[in-house]
Amino acid sequence: CRERKPLGLLFLGGNPEFFKQGFAKVDVPSVLVTNRANNLPFENLSSVATDDIAAGKCAVDALFEAGHDKIGIIGGDPVKSYTSHQRYLGCKESFAEHGKEMNLEVCYEKARFSFDSAYRAMKRLVEKYPDLTAVFAMSDVMAIGAIRALRDMDYRVPEDISVIGFDGTVLAEYYNPKLATIRQQYPVSYTHLTLPTI
């Protein structure tokens, strides 16, 4: 950065807590994309982010409202992944609002954000929670991996087990069955607001 003298920087993902440790050395306007910077004390740092707590809650609310009360979750490690932790908090909030306890040992299965990892996580989840009727996968990629595992175990989706993903990817639109998903949307106005900052 020092040799090229950039006019601005974009930071993608990561835990915002890490910015507290090293961002003070950055002296150009910067934007943190996918995580919030509102609790970070840097005047030259802005952010564009999804409210992952609200998104996690929205996904699980939709499953409860569809009549499900045995809901499993496939997500990243909420201790190690900031985004997974935020979505986990939203899930927990939804469970509480619907009078249910979210027992991590039973209904939550950790996976990497990949088809294969989610496939294996779905198999583990069904083994420990055989009467579940719905799953929230914390990404569309995870949801597709989970659906493949369910089909390989002779479950029908959504007739036997409903699955909802997160991201709203194009792949979700064209997947068969069409994937229910929570869509991340960054309005065009964010781009117009952010680019002049940099």
Regions found by a protein language model. Give the residues of each.
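Periplasmic-binding protein-like
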Residues: E3-G13, G72-G75, Y129-S139, S162-I164
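Short acidic capping loops at alpha-helix termini that bridge into adjacent secondary structure
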Residues: D69-K70, M102-V106, V157-V163
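Alpha-helical recognition/docking segments in bacterial nutrient-uptake
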Residues: C1-D61, E65, E127, D131
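Short acidic, glycine/proline-rich loop/turn micro-motifs
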Residues: F42-L45, G75, Y174-K178
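Hinge/beta->alpha junction and helix N-cap segments in small-molecule ligand-binding domains
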Residues: S47-C58, I74-F95, K100-A121, F136-I144, ...
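A short, hydrophobic C-terminal helix/tail in secreted or cell-surface proteins
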Residues: T194-I198
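Flexible loop/turn connectors
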Residues: K123-L193
